[in-house]
C-alpha cells in the first residue's frame, strides 16, 4: 500500500479547464518508489542539454506536448515549480507523468486517476516493461471532435508503455536517423523543437483505423481499469500499427456469450468456452489485495472495493466483498470434497467518505481476502476453474457478469456433480482411518498454534510497554542534561564526566528502543502473519474433514441389507403371481411403492459409494497440494528465529560498545 496523495480537494478546481483535478498533497509523494521509465530519463538528458527548455515556460511546453497553456500552468503549480529557476529532476519526471496521463484522454482528470488506483503514484499505475500486448477492441482515447494535431508532437503517454525500439521512437523524417545511436537521436529531437513549436495546438490524434467507437458499457465505473495508454511516435514516418491502443487485460475473457459458448454436456469436468482467447492463469504469481479508499454507492449502500493485482502488475481488477463471498459459495458448492480457503465473515461496515488504511476492520478484512486469493491462485484445481479465472481477470463489474451467466454456472455445477452410475470399490475403511487421524492431528495443531499466537500477542504488548519505559528513561536523562545540575553543583571535571555518562546512556537506550521496534515489527509482520496463514489453512482442512465425515455418517451395511430385503420381497411377490396362488405378498399399490423405494435406496447406495471413492482420491490430492503450498509459504518459526538472532547480535554489539565507552571514560 502506498501513500494516498489525493485526499486534499483542490479549491481552484471549479475554475479549471481541465475537468476537476485534485491537487496532490506533495508532488514528491506522487513520484513514490515506482521505477522511472527509461524514456523519461532519456528526455531528462535531452532537456538538460538545452538549459532554456528546463525553465517552466508554459508556452514552450504547451507547444512541445500539445497541451493547453492553462493546463500546463496547473501542472507547474502541482509540481511546485518556480518561473525563475530550472526544473529539478523529480519535478521533471512528475511533469512528464502528468502530461502522459493528460494525453491518454481517458481518464482526463487526476480525480479519475485517483479512483482507478488510489494508492498512486501516477507512474506506478503503468509498468514500462509489461503492458506489451495489443488489443484491437479498445475504446478511443479522445473524442472524435478533438482538433487534429501534428504527428510530430512529442507524445509521452506511450513512454509508460515502450513496445518499440527507442531508435524507432526517436526516429526523424530522415530514414537514416533510425539507425543511429540513441544520444544522436536525442540531439535530433532538440533540433526538431523549433518545427514542433510552429505546429497548431491540440490533442494528439490517432488514425481512425486504429480506434473503435466508444461503447456505453466501457465508461462504467467497473471498467475504469481497462483504459490504457497507446504506443506513440514523434514522427509521421512510423506506421499506424505503432500507435495501436493497448491495455493490460488484452488477452483475457471479457464475458461469456451464450451463443458462442455451448456447454460440454458429455464431460463431467466440462467448462465454459471463452468468447476471446485467454491465457492460462499464472498460478505461481503472488496476488495483492489493496483497499480502494474511494467509497462506492450511496447512503447505507456505501462500501469500499478491493483492488486485486498480481505481483507483475499485468492484471488489476476491482471487486466488492460480496464478489469474494459469492466465489467462496460457488467453490463450496462445486467442490464439496476439496479444501476451500477461508473467507472473512459477513459483517456490516459503513464506508466513511474518507477511508484510511489505519482502519482496523478494513485492514483485517483486506489481509484475509489476500490470503484467500493467494490460496486460490496456488491451487492447481481452483486456479484453472473458468469462473475463478474470470474473477481474477474480468475488468468489468463482476456482479453483472455472474448475473448474466448464473443459469449456465448452475448447469455447469449440476453436470460436474453428476454421479456416474457404475460400481466402484468401497474405500470406506482406509478413508475412515485416515480421517480419524487427520481430525485428531488438525484439532491438536490448531489448539497449539492458537496458544502460540496468543503468547506472541502478549509479547507484542510487553514490547510496547518496554518502548514506553525507554521513552521515559530517555526523557529523564535529557532532563538531567538540560537542567545543568552537575555544572551548577559540582566541579567542572566531574560535571563533564557525569554529562558524558548520561549522554552515552541516553543514546544507548535509544538504540535499544530501535531494536525493540524492529523486533516488534518482526513478530507482527513476519511471524504472526505467517502463523495466522497456517492456522487458517488448518481450520479449512478441519472443515473439509467435517464435510467428508457427513458422507460416512450413512451406514452402507444397513442400506445393503434393506436393499436385499426389498429385492427378496419383490421376487417373492413376482413368483406368487406367476404360480397363481391366492396369497400375494404385496398388492399393486404397495408393490409400486416398494419398487420406488428400492430404486431410491440403490441410487443412495451408488451415490454414497462413488462419493467415498471420490473422497479417497481427492483427499490425497488435497494433502499433496496443501503440502506444496505450505512449503512455498515457508516456516514462520524459522524466519522469526533468523530475525531474532540477527537482532540479538545487534543488541550485543550495542552493549559491547557501551562497555568500551565506559572503560575509556574510567581510564
UniProtKB/Swiss-Prot annotation:
Localization of this protein: Cytoplasm; Endosome membrane
Keyword Zinc-finger tagged: no
Naturally occurring in which organism (per UniProt): Schizosaccharomyces pombe (strain 972 / ATCC 24843) (Fission yeast)
Entry protein name: Sorting nexin mvp1
InterPro entries linked to this entry: PX_dom, PX_dom_sf, SNX8/Mvp1, Snx8_BAR_dom
SUPFAM superfamilies recorded: PX domain
GO biological process, one term: protein transport
Family: Belongs to the sorting nexin family.
Region called Disordered, residue ranges: 221-268, 574-594
Recorded topology in the membrane: Peripheral membrane protein
Function according to Swiss-Prot or TrEMBL: Required for vacuolar protein sorting. Component of the retromer-mediated endosome-to-Golgi retrograde pathway. Required for efficient cargo export from the endosome, promoting Vps1-mediated fission of retromer-coated tubules that bud from the endosome.
Residue positions binding a 1,2-diacyl-sn-glycero-3-phospho-(1D-myo-inositol-3-phosphate): 320, 322, 346
Quaternary data: Homodimer. Forms an autoinhibited tetramer consisting of 2 homodimers that self-interact, wherein the membrane-interacting BAR surfaces are sequestered and the PX lipid-binding sites are occluded. Interacts with Vps1.
Polar residues bias locations: 224-236
Pfam families found in the cross-reference section: PX, Snx8_BAR_dom
GO molecular function, one term: phosphatidylinositol binding
Domain of life: Eukaryota
Amino acid at each position: 500500500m502506498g501513500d494516498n496523495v489525493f485526499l486534499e480537494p483542490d479549491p481552484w478546481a471549479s475554475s479549471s479547464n481541465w475537468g476537476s483535478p485534485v491537487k496532490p498533497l506533495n508532488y514528491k509523494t506522487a513520484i513514490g518508489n515506482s521505477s522511472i521509465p527509461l524514456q523519461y530519463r532519456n528526455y531528462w538528458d535531452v532537456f538538460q542539454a538545452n538549459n532554456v527548455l528546463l525553465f517552466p515556460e508554459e508556452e514552450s511546453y504547451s507547444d512541445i506536448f500539445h497541451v493547453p497553456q492553462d493546463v500546463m500552468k496547473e501542472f507547474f503549480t502541482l509540481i511546485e515549480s518556480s518561473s525563475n529557476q530550472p526544473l529539478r529532476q523529480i519535478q521533471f519526471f512528475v511533469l512528464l507523468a502528468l502530461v502522459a496521463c493528460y494525453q491518454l484522454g481517458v481518464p482526463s482528470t487526476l480525480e479519475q486517476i485517483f479512483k482507478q488506483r488510489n494508492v498512486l503514484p501516477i507512474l506506478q499505475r503503468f509498468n514500462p516493461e509489461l503492458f506489451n500486448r495489443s488489443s484491437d477492441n479498445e475504446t478511443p482515447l479522445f473524442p472524435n471532435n478533438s482538433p487534429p494535431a501534428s504527428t510530430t508532437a512529442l507524445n509521452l503517454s506511450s513512454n509508460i508503455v515502450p513496445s518499440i525500439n527507442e531508435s524507432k521512437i526517436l526516429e526523424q523524417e530522415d530514414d537514416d536517423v533510425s539507425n543511429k545511436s540513441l544520444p544522436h537521436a536525442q540531439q535530433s529531437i532538440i533540433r526538431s523543437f523549433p518545427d514542433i513549436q510552429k505546429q497548431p495546438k491540440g490533442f494528439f490524434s490517432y488514425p481512425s483505423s486504429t480506434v473503435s467507437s466508444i461503447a456505453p458499457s466501457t465508461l462504467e465505473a467497473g471498467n475504469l481499469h481497462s483504459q490504457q495508454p497507446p504506443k506513440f511516435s514523434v514522427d509521421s514516418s512510423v506506421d499506424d500499427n505503432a500507435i495501436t491502443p493497448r491495455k493490460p487485460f488484452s488477452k483475457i475473457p471479457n464475458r461469456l456469450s451464450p451463443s458462442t459458448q455451448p456447454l460440454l454436456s458429455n464431460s463431467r469436468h466440462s467448462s465454459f468456452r471463452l468468447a476471446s482467447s485467454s491465457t492460462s492463469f499464472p498460478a505461481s504469481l503472488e496476488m495483492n489485495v489493496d483497499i480502494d479508499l474511494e467509497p462506492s454507492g450511496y447512503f447505507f449502500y456505501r462500501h469500499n472495493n478491493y483492488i486485486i493485482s498480481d505481483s507483475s502488475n499485468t492484471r488489476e481488477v476491482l471487486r466488492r466483498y460480496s464478489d469474494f463471498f459469492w466465489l467462496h459459495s460457488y467453490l463450496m458448492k462445486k467442490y464439496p470434497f476439496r479444501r476451500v480457503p477461508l473467507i472473512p465473515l459477513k459483517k456490516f461496515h459503513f464506508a466513511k467518505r474518507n477511508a484510511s488504511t489505519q482502519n482496523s476492520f478494513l485492514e483485517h478484512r483486506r489481509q484475509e481476502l489476500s490470503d484467500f486469493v493467494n490460496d486460490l491462485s496456488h491451487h492447481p484445481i481452483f486456479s484453472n476453474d473458468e469462473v475463478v479465472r474470470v474473477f481474477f481477470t474480468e475488468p468489468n463489474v463482476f456482479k453483472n457478469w455472474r448475473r448474466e451467466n448464473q443459469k449456465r454456472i448452475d448447469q455447469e455445477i449440476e453436470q460436474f456433480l453428476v454421479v456416474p452410475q457404475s460400481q466402484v470399490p468401497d474405500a470406506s475403511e482406509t478413508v475412515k482411518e485416515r480421517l480419524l487421524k487427520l481430525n485428531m492431528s488438525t484439532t491438536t495443531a490448531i489448539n497449539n498454534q492458537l496458544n502460540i499466537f496468543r503468547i506472541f500477542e502478549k509479547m507484542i504488548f510487553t514490547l510496547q510497554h518496554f518502548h514506553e519505559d525507554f521513552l521515559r528513561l530517555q526523557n529523564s536523562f535529557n532532563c538531567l542534561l538540560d537542567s545543568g545540575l552537575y555544572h551548577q553543583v559540582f566541579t567542572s571535571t566531574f560535571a563533564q564526566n557525569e554529562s558524558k555518562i548520561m549522554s552515552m546512556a541516553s543514546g544507548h537506550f535509544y538504540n535499544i528502543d530501535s531494536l525493540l521496534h524492529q523486533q516488534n515489527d518482526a513478530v507482527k509482520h513476519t511471524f504472526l502473519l505467517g502463523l495466522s496463514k497456517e492456522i487458517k489453512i488448518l481450520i479449512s482442512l478441519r472443515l473439509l474433514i467435517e464435510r467428508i465425515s457427513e458422507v460416512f455418517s450413512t451406514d452402507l451395511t444397513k442400506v445393503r441389507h434393506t436393499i436385499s430385503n426389498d429385492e427378496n420381497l419383490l421376487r417373492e411377490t413376482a413368483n406368487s403371481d406367476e404360480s397363481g396362488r391366492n396369497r400375494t405378498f404385496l398388492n399393486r399399490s404397495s408393490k409400486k411403492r416398494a419398487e420406488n423405494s428400492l430404486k431410491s435406496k440403490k441410487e443412495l447406495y451408488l451415490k454414497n459409494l462413488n462419493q467415498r471413492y471420490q473422497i479417497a482420491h481427492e483427499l490425497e490430492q488435497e494433502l499433496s497440494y496443501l503440502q506444496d503450498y505450505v512449503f512455498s509459504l515457508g516456516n514462520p518459526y524459522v524466519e522469526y528465529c533468523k530475525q531474532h538472532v540477527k537482532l540479538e547480535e545487534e543488541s550485543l554489539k550495542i552493549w559491547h560498545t557501551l562497555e568500551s565507552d565506559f572503560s575509556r571514560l574510567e581510564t
